[in-house]
A protein has these predicted regions:
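Hydrophobic alpha-helix-in-membranes signature
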Residues: 21-23, 68
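Short aromatic-glycine-(Arg/Gly/Cys) micro-motifs in beta-strand/loop hairpins
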Residues: 8-21
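A short, exposed loop/beta-hairpin motif centered on an aromatic-Gly-Thr core
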Residues: 24-33
Length: 79
């Protein structure tokens, strides 16, 4: 059965960090976005194998992702 996971990529000093939204333990880094994608896919495969071996429930993908806009300079101080 095919599951789709949502990946988040963040630019870091050494390249890119990739992490799955639905499975935050699946995280990796690469020198560029392509390497990071490849390594994230490999990390996901390894995590699926580890979870199966430990008889743990594999998190399902398919999260709903949306951006939440905010004008940071318009936010006042809290009480």
């Amino acid at each position: 059965m095919l599951h789709n996971y949502s990946a988040k990529y963040t630019k870091i000093a050494s390249g890119y960090m990739g992490q799955l939204i639905e499975w935050p333990e699946v995280v990796t880094e690469g020198k560029d976005i392509e390497e990071c994608r490849m390594m994230l896919r490999d990390a996901l495969n390894e995590m699926v194998l580890a979870y199966r071996e430990q008889r743990k429930e594999i998190p399902l993908g398919g999260a709903l992702i949306e951006q939440v806009p905010i004008e940071v300079q318009d936010v006042g101080q809290t009480a």
